[in-house]
């Protein structure tokens, strides 16, 4: 097959790293794979994996008919079989490019915590959690597949030479004491609350523990994060919080940590490095990954919703105060997390599932009449969405990561997902 993969951007972030690594795995299985997108730091990763990169046209608003036309032209001239968009703007652009070309199929992957209702319901959709898949099937999506965020377990593992000493030297991180690391985009939606409460939690730990919180990432909330870090460092009289910014290769940040905090793909990469993981969510949610909590995360994804922001810092403080001094417990939890990733989230398994999705998308058995009505339904959702966004901008309530701002996160029994499922 000839496949074009279109991440939503090429800045450092979980969804786009997953897209590129999975494209590389599919390429290694003998399929021609092109990465299309707006140039950014991850273009270098695309090239390291031996993939061709094609720059998308620069447009002000997304989705863009200019991008859709560029995709359609590329599909025609390169005889591409699959146009694969990650997140909703690329998904719509791929869909528009493919809809008048019966030999080309569009597919969509959404790794956000909720799916935009205006992605046409007959478009093959991949999501990252069983909970989201159930919600989407319940609203009539006909082709929903769960593909949990894959991890390259060879490129992300203990024992690699990742210039860890240089990272410590550059940011003044002492070999003594403990390092708690979070690798995250500094987004106001989904991420900011947890990052701020993590700083407060670490600042409240006993001074004798000498805990350093290493934050690797950048984004629109950098000013708020930087301001809080400065306050914490003044209050504690030392460099309690290190704000390292966006690292071209953040693997060293995972590796130097004694404990990692995170959600989604970042949480899984922390596990690949054999680190104890405290899963970050919203409304004060923090939970340590253990054999007993694994089932929850296999159902709802590596994320959660707590009972309120006010208790977040104290909840995390309690977890850290228990596991940081317990070296044996940390080793056991790290080994458990590594085994979960190896058995359930390997890149090779994900590539095989992805190829099955592509093959099904190319199957000519489809109903054009049903597709027509579902397009009308999707168009109605999109127009209502645009109207709400315009109203939000006018009232100052606009959000950049809009579908991460309304995540699917309902409570549900998880008896079907046990620690045994990791194997």
What function would you assign to each model-found segment?
Residues 157-173:
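A short helix/loop element that forms part of the nucleotide-sugar donor recognition site in Leloir-type
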Residues 115, 122-162:
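Donor nucleotide-sugar binding/catalytic pocket of nucleotide-sugar-dependent glycosyltransferases
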Residues 4, 151, 166, 174-192, ...:
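Conserved donor-binding/catalytic core segment of Leloir-type glycosyltransferases
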Residues 85-91, 110:
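Short His-centered aromatic/hydrophobic patch
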Residues 5-13, 19, 24-63, 219-224:
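N-terminal strand-loop element at the rim of the active site
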Residues 329-344, 356:
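A short, well-ordered alpha-helix in the C-terminal region of glycosyltransferases
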Residues 226-247:
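Nucleotide-activated donor-binding/catalytic signature segment of Leloir-type glycosyltransferases, i.e.
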């Amino acid at each position: 097959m000839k496949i074009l993969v279109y991440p939503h951007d090429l800045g450092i972030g979980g969804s786009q790293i997953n897209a590129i690594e999975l494209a590389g795995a599919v390429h290694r299985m003998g399929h021609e794979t092109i990465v299309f997108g707006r140039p950014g730091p991850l273009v270098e990763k695309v090239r390291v994996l031996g993939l061709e990169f094609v720059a998308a046209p620069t447009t002000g608003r997304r989705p863009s008919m200019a991008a859709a036309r560029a995709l359609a032209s590329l599909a025609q001239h390169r005889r591409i079989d699959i146009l694969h968009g990650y997140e909703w703007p690329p998904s719509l652009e791929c869909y528009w490019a493919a809809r008048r070309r019966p030999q080309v199929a569009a597919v969509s992957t959404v790794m956000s915590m909720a799916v935009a209702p205006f992605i046409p319901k007959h478009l093959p959709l991949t999501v990252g959690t069983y909970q989201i898949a159930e919600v989407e099937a319940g609203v009539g999506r006909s082709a929903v597949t769960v593909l949990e965020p894959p991890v390259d377990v060879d490129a992300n593992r203990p024992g690699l030479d990742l210039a860890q000493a240089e990272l410590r030297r550059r940011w003044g991180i002492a070999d003594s004491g403990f390092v708690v690391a979070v690798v995250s985009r500094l987004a106001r939606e989904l991420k900011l609350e947890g990052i701020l409460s993590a700083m407060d939690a670490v600042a409240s730990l006993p001074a004798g523990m000498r805990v350093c919180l290493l934050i690797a990432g950048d984004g629109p909330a950098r000013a708020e994060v930087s301001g809080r870090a400065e306050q914490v460092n003044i209050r504690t009289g030392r460099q309690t919080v290190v704000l390292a910014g966006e690292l071209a290769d953040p693997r060293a940040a995972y590796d130097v940590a004694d404990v990692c905090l995170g959600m989604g793909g970042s949480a899984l990469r922390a596990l690949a490095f054999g680190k104890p993981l405290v899963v970050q969510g919203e409304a004060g949610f923090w939970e340590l990954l253990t054999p007993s909590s694994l089932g929850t995360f296999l159902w709802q994804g590596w994320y959660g919703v707590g009972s309120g922001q006010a208790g977040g810092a104290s909840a995390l403080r309690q977890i850290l105060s228990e596991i940081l001094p317990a070296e044996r417990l940390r080793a056991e939890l790290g080994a458990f997390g590594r085994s979960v990733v190896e058995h359930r989230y390997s890149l090779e398994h994900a590539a095989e599932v992805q190829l099955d999705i592509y093959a099904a998308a190319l199957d000519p058995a489809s109903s054009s009449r049903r597709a027509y009505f579902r397009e009308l339904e999707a168009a109605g959702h999109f127009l209502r969405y645009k109207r709400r966004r315009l109203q939000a901008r006018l009232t100052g309530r606009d959000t950049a990561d809009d579908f991460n701002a309304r995540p699917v996160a309902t409570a549900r029994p998880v008896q079907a997902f046990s620690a045994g499922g990791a194997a």
